Swiss-Prot record:
Membrane topology: Multi-pass membrane protein
Chain positions recorded as pheophytin a binding sites: 130, 143
Keywords: Acetylation, Chlorophyll, Chloroplast, Chromophore, Electron transport, Iron, Magnesium, Membrane, Metal-binding, Oxidoreductase, Phosphoprotein, Photosynthesis, Photosystem II, Plastid, Thylakoid, Transmembrane, Transmembrane helix, Transport
Modification sites for Phosphothreonine: 2
Note: 2 of the reaction center chlorophylls (ChlD1 and ChlD2) are entirely coordinated by water.
Name of the protein this chain belongs to: Photosystem II D2 protein
Binding site for a plastoquinone: 215, 262
Cross-referenced Pfam families: Photo_RC (PF00124)
Domain of life: Eukaryota
Length: 353
């Protein structure tokens, strides 16, 4: 048997190894494998949105002016959804609708599908970026897991909901006032505010804001700095690197306030992670239900009684009336291509039915 002394086995490097080294090397802005998805998609999504809000009209899809060029401002400009007749077409520039004509593609609403799809994959790339960097510095992946919540909301609202409806037309347009209109649409056609999944989402977001405020205030309240001086205001020095707040003092404070308090930082911060993420995921699940036109909390008995007894009215029946008004006014305004004409007898009256 022959033994080679002084030689070591070295695996042959491939192009993949070279690419891996370049993508993951330490630089000011980390690229990584996730960057191959994140950076192009984010660039195209933002570029498409800025292009649409600056130059592109929605006259051919919604009968609206939605660009700076037409006189809109930041709050009223938008990249609008495609025409209802486009259904669920991906509206590729080279597809049968636009046939390579960029102007026609913009007129049909192609920029909306462009922004929505690149935006979705850009968000997913950002989550993968958090996984990748956490892996490289030996951290747990909770940041990426938390970021799955806003991704779930984006995908459910902008993609899954219109997929359950007749077309992309019923998704939100990408603009501030456009999102407000979509919220009113959700209320009028789905009674969204009374949906338990929406309630859980509100509880999660507002509860997280409350937890964030309480946590920040408590840490500031219990800051200390080593020393014998009576004046502890120096503890607010923002450049001090060490952890300088007292968990014991915070625990005692909230035990006196509420009677209960978090006993360790791990459970406290996990709870601060759990509340908003769970809330956003629940709201995303609720929107998936709306995509299928599922309804929740229709108190029909109150509606029937309100119809029979003009003196009986609840906040629920008043809201049902408001929803009817939203539908009656919005449907004709929002879907002019349907040429809807509502006779007087179907417009909202003075009771729930």
């Amino acid at each position: 048997m022959t033994i080679a002394i002084g030689s070591t086995y070295q695996e042959k490097r491939t192009w993949f190894d070279d690419a891996d080294d370049w993508l993951r090397q330490d630089r000011f802005v980390f690229v990584g494998w996730s960057g191959l998805l994140l950076f192009p998609c984010a660039y195209f999504a933002l570029g498409g949105w800025f292009t649409g809000t600056t130059f592109v009209t929605s006259w051919y899809t919604h009968g609206l002016a939605t660009s700076y060029l037409e006189g809109c401002n930041f709050l009223t400009a938008a990249v609008s959804t495609p025409a209802n007749s486009m259904a669920h077409s991906l509206l590729f520039l080279w597809g049968p609708e636009a046939q390579g004509d960029f102007t026609r593609w913009c007129q049909l609403g192609g920029l909306w599908t462009f922004v929505a799809l690149h935006g979705s994959f850009g968000l997913i790339g950002f989550m993968l970026r958090q996984f990748e960097i956490a892996r490289s510095v030996n951290l747990r992946p909770y940041n990426a897991i938390a970021f799955s919540a806003p991704i779930a909301v984006f995908v459910s609202v902008f993609l899954i909901y219109p997929l359950g409806q007749s077309g992309w037309f019923f998704a939100p347009s990408f603009g501030v006032a456009a999102i407000f209109r979509f919220i009113l649409f959700f209320q009028g056609f789905h009674n969204w505010t009374l949906n338990p999944f929406h309630m859980m989402g509100v509880a999660g977001v507002l509860g997280a804001a409350l937890l964030c405020a309480i946590h920040g205030a408590t840490v500031e309240n219990t800051l200390f700095e080593d020393g014998d001086g009576a004046n502890t205001f120096r503890a607010f020095n923002p450049t001090q690197a060490e952890e300088t707040y007292s968990m014991v003092t915070a625990n005692r404070f909230w035990s006196q306030i509420f009677g209960v308090a978090f006993s360790n930082k791990r459970w406290l911060h996990f709870f601060m992670l759990l509340v908003p993420v769970t809330g956003l995921w629940m709201s995303a699940i609720g929107v998936v239900g709306l995509a299928l036109n599922l309804r929740a909390y229709d108190f029909v008995s109150q509606e029937i009684r309100a119809a029979e007894d003009p003196e009986f009215e609840t906040f629920y029946t008043k809201n049902i009336l408001l929803n009817e008004g939203i539908r009656a006014w919005m449907a004709a305004q929002d879907q002019p291509h349907e040429r809807l004409v509502f006779p007087e007898e179907v417009l909202p009256r003075g009771n729930a039915l």
